[in-house]
Amino acid sequence: GATHLILDDTGAVAGVSWKHFGETGSIRAKSVVIAAGGFVMNSDMVSAYTPKLAEKPFVLGNTYDDGLGIRLGVSAGGATKHMDQAFITAPAYPPAILLTGIIVNKLGQRFVAEDSYHSRTSGFVMDQPDSAAYLIVDEEHLQRPEFPLVKFIDGWETVEEMESALGMPAGSLVATLDHYNTYAARGEDPDFHKQPEFLAAQDTGPWAAFDLSLGKAMYSGFTVGGLATDVDGRVLDSDAHPIRGLYAAGACASNLAQDGKGYSSGTQLGSGSFFGRRAGAHAAANSR
């Protein structure tokens, strides 16, 4: 595979060197397109840039998500963007009825609309104290998740008992649930604007809790950051100037979503195919 980029005296990319078992060589090229993976399989890069992914989650990727493409681009003067961001998720739904409950942190506070896309919810979980969170539902809305990714902790006859068992400050969960129930009964959520179809008072005991905490739920994820590029896939330097002859597309280029909270499944497919085509066309024109 590729080992390093070759630059000419002006700093433009002029080719690439390669190694295949014991053989080595170089290829002269007017344009080089890096179309490689992210860096989720590179433990050193993950620890340096996205430590949450290094703690517990199951990584989503393949052996070629080793960050080589990004490192090649950086070696030629390329800048990176969003390297500290990651897609990480452990969906508690389906069934959708679970989204009528509330998700709270270890302080008993809500922090996200429960009907958010699952990676957005998970991204906010990562921001909470100790990356700990719980999904709370009452008996009327309790069902088992269809995917066994979040652990059922237990059920309690009163909210006060649940609050104590989960180690939350006295009165915190009671106040949060009372506030939520008051507005949910009216079909409103002034705090996080959850859609009315997912609003329902959780006021019929007993109450159950599912553990969404990092290290308890089965999270999976991948990296979002990569080389900075323009609309033609040209790799940019730290001053946002294109590096002549160098292009990048796919997971080695920074994602359109910019962070895991803004990512939606399939985004990489769209950006990879669209900007890959633009990069290829521009590189071909540059090579004439």
What annotation goes with each model-predicted range?
Residues 1-178, 182-288:
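Residues forming the flavin
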